[in-house]
Design a protein with these regions (language model features):
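Helicase motor interdomain insertion/brace
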Residues: 3, 9-23, 41-183
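Short glycine-/polar-rich loops that comprise or flank the Walker A/P-loop
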Residues: 7-10, 29-31
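Short amphipathic
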Residues: 14, 30-36
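Conserved C-terminal "switch" segment of AAA+ ATPases
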Residues: 24-25, 36
Length: 183
């Protein structure tokens, strides 16, 4: 909705390769995924976020939750009903782990500014573990502090620089698929 409003778009029409009005114009395309590593400074922030998340997983396991080593948002979301009905002492670490997972995903995929905006919005809410996360979790607060420093230095996600580099070296038409997140 926000994108449509910003572009002053009133209606959307969905098409794909097999749509009758599109099919005659489909050409062979070359798709290339270009992996982009985070900068060393961003990896430090990422490490602090992962340590904060690991601490929640340790606490949840200590409280009797069976969680795999594969840390995923879906695993945490699936544990909500069990925790709310049968293991209330795990509510705080569970909901905090969910928030950290969201923050980590935003940081890795979208960069520093969306991560900090997410943190600002989350900090202003009320809920299980928010105060602890933003006031006493040394790893999470250190990640925010480092991210603010990087933002002040003009550092964002390295995918933007990589995209610019690729576009300067290509002479053909290019389609860029992007994920937009600011919520």
């Amino acid at each position: 909705k926000e994108i449509c409003d910003n572009l002053h778009v009133r209606g959307l029409a969905e098409r794909n390769d097999s749509s009758p009005d599109v099919k005659p114009y489909i050409q062979e395309t070359k798709t290339e995924w270009v992996p982009v590593d985070l900068s060393s400074d961003m990896k430090i922030i990422q490490r602090y976020l992962k340590i904060a998340l690991d601490q929640r997983y340790i606490e949840l396991r200590r409280n009797g939750l069976r969680l795999s080593d594969n840390k995923s948002l879906s695993q945490l979301l699936n544990a909500r009903q069990f925790v709310l009905k049968q293991n209330r002492r795990s509510a705080n670490p569970l909901f905090t782990a969910i928030r950290i997972t969201y923050a980590l995903n935003i940081f890795e995929a979208h960069g520093i500014t969306p991560f900090l905006k997410f943190c600002d919005r989350t900090k202003s809410k009320k809920g299980a573990g928010i105060k602890e996360l933003f006031e006493t979790d040394q790893n999470f607060t250190k990640a925010i502090e480092l991210a603010k420093t990087q933002q002040a230095n003009g550092i964002e996600h390295p995918k933007i620089d990589k995209l610019t580099e690729i576009l300067r070296s290509v002479e053909s038409k290019v389609l860029i698929f992007s994920s937009y997140r600011d919520s």
